[in-house]
């Protein structure tokens, strides 16, 4: 069996889709469907069972036996960088992850988890080491703290423990994220309403590493298949502008022009203006596949979003 936490979310559901493509159906999905809209991400996927997150955590703490587990992909967390309830975030993103990590270590189950480029804050080197990290929000801090915990444990681990610092992930199965969904998703919705795509003023200067979710799923499965341990960046290695994202959306629709709107005051001091994954460590570990550019990834995503049902 393979367990995917956050399996109804963006990255988790795409990992399940990739596992299905490999012929794996023996998948236990763990998630919190309080937001019932997320179920649509699972409708076309083949899984063995579903477990509520709270029930799963209780079982993990109790040390319950789930049978033979080939791997756990831990993608379940509060992913809202705008969430400021520190107690909630630390319970969801830190304490929960520690419990699951120790469950896996004790049973030598390969453990692959979601870290985040938010751990870097406004640093500009994006190298997977403590001195290059400085989160700007409590979400980033919760991820940073778990990375630090893993770094202490890795030398003694006898089974794979691998974290990926996800950069700006976009692609199919993110509609449930609302305001936290990708720029490409929101711009497409604006176009469907007959509006022009809107970007914050100055967006042509904001450069981000936008990584297609299908590529993220591939990296996770590669790490599992090769028994990889460590903490790695997961991005394209390219910094591209929000304007390039908008251009890709416009190219798909074949009409419209970019409009600018004022930049929100409350985001100014907490906004990463530049991200670009340093892939040196990932490449050294043996991952050689290419990552889609914004032009390639957004074009594929637009086809998926606008497919005929």
From Swiss-Prot:
Cofactors, names only: NADP(+)
EC assignment: 5.1.3.20
Residues engaged in binding substrate: 168, 179, 186, 200-203, 208, 271
Keyword terms of this UniProt record: Carbohydrate metabolism, Isomerase, NADP
Gene Ontology annotations of biological process type: ADP-L-glycero-beta-D-manno-heptose biosynthetic process; carbohydrate metabolic process
InterPro entries: Epimerase_deHydtase, Heptose_epim, NAD(P)-bd_dom_sf
Gene3D superfamilies, alphabetized: NAD(P)-binding Rossmann-like Domain, UDP-galactose 4-epimerase, domain 1
Active site positions, chain numbering: 139, 177
This protein's record includes keyword NADP: yes
Disulfide bonds: none
Coiled-coil positions: none
Enzyme class: isomerase
Reactions catalysed, as given in the entry: ADP-D-glycero-beta-D-manno-heptose = ADP-L-glycero-beta-D-manno-heptose
Pathway: Nucleotide-sugar biosynthesis; ADP-L-glycero-beta-D-manno-heptose biosynthesis; ADP-L-glycero-beta-D-manno-heptose from D-glycero-beta-D-manno-heptose 7-phosphate: step 4/4
GO-annotated molecular function: ADP-glyceromanno-heptose 6-epimerase activity; NADP binding
Sites where the protein binds NADP(+): 10-11, 31-32, 38, 53, 75-79, 92, 143, 169, 177
Cofactor mode of binding and number, as noted: Binds 1 NADP(+) per subunit.
Complex formation: Homopentamer.
Domain remark in the UniProt entry: Contains a large N-terminal NADP-binding domain, and a smaller C-terminal substrate-binding domain.
Purpose: Catalyzes the interconversion between ADP-D-glycero-beta-D-manno-heptose and ADP-L-glycero-beta-D-manno-heptose via an epimerization at carbon 6 of the heptose.
NCBIfam families per record: heptose_epim, PRK11150.1
Family: Belongs to the NAD(P)-dependent epimerase/dehydratase family. HldD subfamily.
Protein name according to UniProt: ADP-L-glycero-D-manno-heptose-6-epimerase
Gene: hldD
